[in-house]
Amino acid sequence: MYLFRIISLNLSGVFLFLSYTPLYITYLLGVVISSMMLTVGTFAITLDIILCILVVCFLITTLLVIDSVLDSIRGLNSVGVLVRIIQYCFLWFVFSEFMLFVVFFYTLYSECLLINVEFTNIGCPVTTKYSNIILDLGYIFYWFLFDFFNIILNTVYLFISGLCCNNVLSSILCREYLLSKIILGSSIFLGLLFIWNQVWEFNILIITLSVNIFCTILFSIDTLHFMHVLVGIVFMIISIFNIQSKKIGDIRIVLIVCIIFYWHFVDIVWFFLLRFIYLDTLMVLK
C-alpha cells in the first residue's frame, strides 16, 4: 500500500508515526550536540556533551523496546518487523559515524594546548601547534587565496541539496513521482558538483598526507567526508529507481526517510569542517 493510504488507517498510521519518531528525535539531539560544539569553538568533551550522547543512546534503546512491545501487541507481520530493523540499524550506523567524526576532531584538538588569539576583540581558541602549522611557509595563505571561494560554493551546494531532499517525501505522498525524481536528481547533481570541486581542490593544491601536518589533517577528514557524500549519492540513485517502479510501500518509504536523514548528517559534518578547519585558519590568517 502507498503511504497516504496507510496513514489514513489508524493502526498502520500509528506504526509509521512511531517509526519516524526515533529518527526525528535523534536528528534534533544531534543538532543540539552540534550546536553546543560549534558554540564552544573546541572539541573539549564537556559533561554536557557526554550527557547528550548518553541521552541519545538511552532514547534509541527505549524507543526500540517500546516499538517491540507495541509490535507484539498489534501482531505486525514480518514486513513491519523488517521496517523496524532497518530503522534502528540505520540509526546506530549514523550515530557510530557521528562518533567517528567526533573522535577525529577531538584528537586534533586534545593533543595541543589552547591559546587565546585575539580576533576583532573576540577570543578564538586555536592550538599552539595548529597556529604554527598555519604560518608554515605561507602555504595556507596560498590555500586561502585560491580556494576560499570554492569552499563557499561547496557549502551552497550541500545546503541547497539538503533543502531539495526535504521536499522528496511530500511529493511522494502526493503521488508526484516525476517531481520527486526531479528533486532527487537535483540533489544528486549538486552532490556531484561538490565532489568535482573537492577533487579540483586536492589537485590544484597538491594536498597529500605527506606535505605537512595541516594537509594531513585536511586530507584525512575531507576524504572521509568525501566518501560519505559519494555513498549518499549512491543511495539517492537507488531511491530514484525505487520511485520509478511506483511501488512505494512501508519499507521503501522508511528507506527514503533514512536516506534524507543520512544526507542531513553529511551536511552537518561539512559545517563542522567549515567551522573547525577552514574558518579557524581564516581567523589566524586575519
Curated annotation (Swiss-Prot):
EC number(s) stated in the UniProt entry for this protein: 7.1.1.9
A Pfam match: COX3
Enzyme class: translocase
Membrane topology, record value: Multi-pass membrane protein
Keywords, ordered alphabetically: Membrane, Mitochondrion, Mitochondrion inner membrane, Translocase, Transmembrane, Transmembrane helix
Sample GO molecular function, one term: cytochrome-c oxidase activity
Catalyzed chemical reaction(s): 4 Fe(II)-[cytochrome c] + O2 + 8 H(+)(in) = 4 Fe(III)-[cytochrome c] + 2 H2O + 4 H(+)(out)
Intracellular or extracellular location(s): Mitochondrion inner membrane
Predominant localisation class: mitochondrion
GO cellular component: mitochondrial inner membrane
InterPro entries: Cyt_c/ubiquinol_Oxase_su3, Cyt_c_oxidase-like_su3, Cyt_c_oxidase_su3-like_sf, Cyt_c_oxidase_su3_a-hlx
Biological-process GO terms, alphabetical: aerobic electron transport chain
TM ranges: 13-33, 40-60, 85-105, 133-153, 173-195, 199-221, 223-243, 253-273
Its job: Component of the cytochrome c oxidase, the last enzyme in the mitochondrial electron transport chain which drives oxidative phosphorylation. The respiratory chain contains 3 multisubunit complexes succinate dehydrogenase (complex II, CII), ubiquinol-cytochrome c oxidoreductase (cytochrome b-c1 complex, complex III, CIII) and cytochrome c oxidase (complex IV, CIV), that cooperate to transfer electrons derived from NADH and succinate to molecular oxygen, creating an electrochemical gradient over the inner membrane that drives transmembrane transport and the ATP synthase.
Quaternary structure note: Component of the cytochrome c oxidase (complex IV, CIV), a multisubunit enzyme composed of a catalytic core of 3 subunits and several supernumerary subunits. The complex exists as a monomer or a dimer and forms supercomplexes (SCs) in the inner mitochondrial membrane with ubiquinol-cytochrome c oxidoreductase (cytochrome b-c1 complex, complex III, CIII).
Family indicated by similarity: Belongs to the cytochrome c oxidase subunit 3 family.
Name of the molecule in the record: Cytochrome c oxidase subunit 3
Organism of origin: Trypanoplasma borreli
Gene name per UniProt: COIII
